Design a protein with these regions (language model features):
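Short acidic loop-to-helix transition motifs that present clustered carboxylates
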Residues: 23, 45, 174-176
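Flexible loop residues that form catalytic
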Residues: 28, 66, 196
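Functionally critical loop-and-helix segments that line ligand-binding/catalytic clefts
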Residues: 32-44, 55, 185-228
Length: 228
């Protein structure tokens, strides 16, 4: 069956006022109903993993791996990815990654996937407990239309799946509901949607099951703070 996750973006690093993008995850209710995690990239700077682990508030992490640059004709690795990957592994934090998409068409999406696959294989940073997510939310992509955006998304994900990776799709809920044909996405894709609602105060909401039937991950805030 589908694994369910939720996400609370941008949890702050202690002493720096930076924001880590964080997550709540629900995998197997038999063991634990809700799992909290963080979503991080270069925007959060250097994370204090010792404090992060000691806080006992984080069950997993999803980190930005990078993006394909059309101008540079190469895959650009997020400047903090390799450090975050290494320290997540050292601290036994279950890990997933996401690629930010700038694809204009199916061919671009396949190129993004193949360049990511090449990087993962060449770097050896390719062991993940959680899916590889396709982050599709660029304003310039909206004009392509629902079908094209969905075709782009599926092209990336199927290329990654064929290389042996679990996959998922990330965007904000309005995008997923209005700019994509999400019912076309295969059932084995994890779906991660951001919706901060009207009470975006950084606290874990009481209605954590709000999107349990819609998304596998619900990203519910960009205001939360944790040690690390």
């Amino acid at each position: 069956g589908r694994r369910n996750y939720d996400d609370q973006r941008k949890l702050g690093t202690v002493g720096k006022g930076l924001r880590i993008e964080g997550i709540k995850i629900r995998i197997v209710s038999k063991y634990k109903k809700h799992y909290i995690g963080i979503d991080v990239s270069h925007w959060q700077g250097d994370i204090n993993y010792e404090k992060l682990v000691a806080s006992q508030k984080i069950d997993f992490m999803i980190t930005k791996v990078g993006w394909y640059s059309e101008n540079n004709k190469r895959f650009i690795v997020d400047s903090k990815f390799e450090k975050n990957y290494k320290l997540a592994k050292q601290n036994k934090i279950p890990l997933g990654i996401y690629l930010y998409s700038y694809a204009k068409n199916v061919e671009d999406a396949k190129l993004e996937a193949n360049e990511l696959i090449k990087y993962l294989k060449s770097s050896g940073n390719s062991s993940f407990e959680l899916p590889i997510f396709y982050d599709i939310e660029e304003d310039s992509q909206i004009s392509y239309g629902k079908k094209a955006i969905t075709d782009i998304t599926i092209a990336f994900c199927e290329t990654m799946k064929n290389a042996g990776y679990e996959v998922g799709v990330y965007s904000y809920s309005y995008w997923l509901n209005n700019y994509m044909e999400i019912l076309r996405l295969p059932a084995d894709y994890s779906l991660w949607g951001a919706d901060y609602g009207t009470n975006n105060n950084g606290q874990i909401p009481s209605d954590l099951d709000k999107y349990s039937k819609t998304y596998d991950i619900w990203q519910f805030t960009d205001k939360a703070q944790i040690d690390g």
